[in-house]
């Protein structure tokens, strides 16, 4: 009897997880964002976000930070849970060379509507906490990276070369926006991850 109850409980948990996963936005197809494969400079307005500050290797602390962000975000009322109004998560790190990844001070964020003014209690875990913030933009240079996160360097170099060739210089942190990546239950195919790499830039007079 106990074994049967345990099996039922496990099935319920798996089913609940599957329902959540099925309801999550899948991200765009490569065809929908193909225009981003070439670097470009655009104007972006400020974005209200849920934000977590976390120091350490993004491959380790990033999972915890995004887990807390998602838990907080999907517990809020009045935020889009899917559709065209849903905006994917993003993160920022310093761009100085020579800083070990363990020393990176990352900002992990989930965009929210400007009308959101408070997030309530229960938005903290494991020494991390969620806060409301506004990310400033202005002129930005960006490019789409297709594939694994650890294979981004050539794409980053293309974007940085483009910035210099257009008479601009980087102003601010390295930013990534995760259009398509690992899901809650399954990692997916890393070779098909879609990531926008972005820098705030200013004209180099």
Language-model-detected regions and their locations in the chain:
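A solvent-exposed interaction/effector surface
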Residues: 3-205
């Amino acid at each position: 009897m106990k074994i049967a109850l345990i099996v039922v409980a496990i099935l319920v948990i798996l089913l609940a997880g599957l329902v959540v996963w099925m309801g999550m936005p899948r991200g765009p197809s490569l065809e929908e964002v193909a225009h981003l494969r070439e670097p470009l400079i655009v104007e972006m307005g400020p974005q209200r976000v849920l934000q977590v500050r976390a120091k350490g290797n993004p491959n380790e602390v990033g999972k915890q930070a995004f887990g807390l962000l998602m838990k907080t975000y999907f517990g809020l009322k009045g935020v889009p849970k899917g559709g065209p109004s849903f905006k994917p998560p993003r993160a920022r790190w310093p761009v100085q060379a020579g800083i070990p990844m363990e020393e990176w001070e990352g900002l992990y964020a989930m965009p929210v509507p400007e009308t959101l003014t408070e997030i309530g209690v229960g938005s903290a875990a494991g020494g991390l906490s969620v806060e409301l913030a506004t990310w400033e933009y202005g002129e930005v240079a960006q490019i789409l990276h297709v594939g694994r996160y650890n294979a981004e360097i050539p794409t980053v170099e293309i974007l940085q070369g483009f910035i210099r060739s257009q008479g601009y210089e980087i102003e601010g942190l390295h930013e990534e926006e995760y259009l398509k990546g690992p899901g809650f239950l399954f990692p997916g195919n890393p070779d098909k991850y879609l990531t926008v790499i972005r820098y705030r830039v200013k004209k180099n007079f």
